[in-house]
Amino acid sequence: MAAPMLRHLCRVPQSGVWTRGPRAVRPGARGMLVAPRARGLFKEFFPESGTKTELPELFDRRRAGSPQTVYCGFDPTGDSLHVGHLLTLLGLFHFQRAGHNVIALVGGSTALLGDPSGRTKEREALSAECVRANARALQRGLETLAANHARLFADGRPWGTFTVLDNAAWFQKQHLMDFLATVGGHFRMGTLLSRLSVQSRLKSPEGMSLAEFFYQVLQAYDFYYLFRHYGCRVQLGGSDQLGNIMSGYEFIHKLTGEDVFGITVPLITSTTGAKLGKSAGNAVWLNREKTSPFELYQFFIRQQDDSVERYLKLFTFLPLPEIDHIMQLHVKEPEKRIAQKRLAAEVTKLVHGQEGLDSAKRCTQALYHSSIEALEVMSDQELKELFKEASFSELVLDPGTSVIDTCRKANAIPDGPRGYRMITEGGVSINHRQVTNPESVLVIGQHILKNGLSLLKIGKRNFYIIKWLQL
């Protein structure tokens, strides 16, 4: 007996794949797709022609009459989204802003297999418990980003809905033999083997496991399930997902005779050409506990001049004329990094909210501009995020506590004459102010900030954070 989720499978249509040639599309129908493509956000459309309804016509509300549904998948192979996920999320948000409904699909089941796309070797296997925990974390992250988007980037237009789902909701109800009997028969081995992601792995020394090979079948079924239950006709994914998207298209078309579509976004790579993802070990996370707002902000501040215009178009909702104006100002005074600062501000606000952006700016002022004012209003959390390697101490401020007393209690200098000389020779600063008299008594408001903290620096790189008690 077929599993519950498979009972609605349709018969394979006799007509086969559509073979119509491309035809003219009504003026204005391409608008929804033209704007993101002009920004460089949409890279490839599949299929581009030969379908009953052309992809641009789906998004022509005058013709379609109702909003479309678009989805993108996020496998919980880690416990946080990272900057490599941002482009597909921005793609979903652009559809939502145009009034269409979007689904962020967490792969609580597919992550157990591991997507081989774009990988040179098999992923490290994760336990079911780990995947479930990661899936919950990704769902929270997606909901936070969607909430920030709605709260801080509203433009007055009626938006579509943003829904987060987990494919474990339907795959956990499946039975292996039923699934293979009812779904497996609609996939041809030759077609699956022809995918570039499969070919590259089969030619590699490590080869490819059956679990990885089967991944594209499960992703195709995701697309089918969302098509049947949510009316979803468009899948969004990274450019390395095109093969999986094609499998979904072929599966749905065989079963229903209907056309669905895929849109890819470009992959963002590091300066060495490696994909910016956690697998490469260079991830910038979208979770504050893993990458602070300050670190995210600085990641975009550090982008090169030859990349910043492209990133403004990809990672922000700023109108293209405004981006042109920003770049004109930037070219006149590149040393001010006007474009990078605007890019960093827009992304940090989307990921961490206005509070996170304010925190990133405070940390920037405190670290790079030696701002006492910024230090005074920083929270314990911000100080720990900014000075991750710093030792954190809680000390009682006794009457007459001196500079050398403080340094020794914090274990910041060696005992004896050597530690004394480190102070007299200018190697110690408190709150960005050099101190050279070891016997100087600490002064509240100078050595101890309004927030009850002191930032002690020994040499050029060693920081110590002191929280004073009983002030």
UniProtKB/Swiss-Prot annotation:
EC numbers on record: 6.1.1.1
Subcellular location(s) of the protein: Mitochondrion matrix
N6-acetyllysine: residues carrying this PTM: K349, K361
Residues that bind ATP: D75, I268, K278
Chemical reaction(s) catalysed: tRNA(Tyr) + L-tyrosine + ATP = L-tyrosyl-tRNA(Tyr) + AMP + diphosphate + H(+)
Membrane-spanning residues: none
Name of the protein: Tyrosine--tRNA ligase, mitochondrial
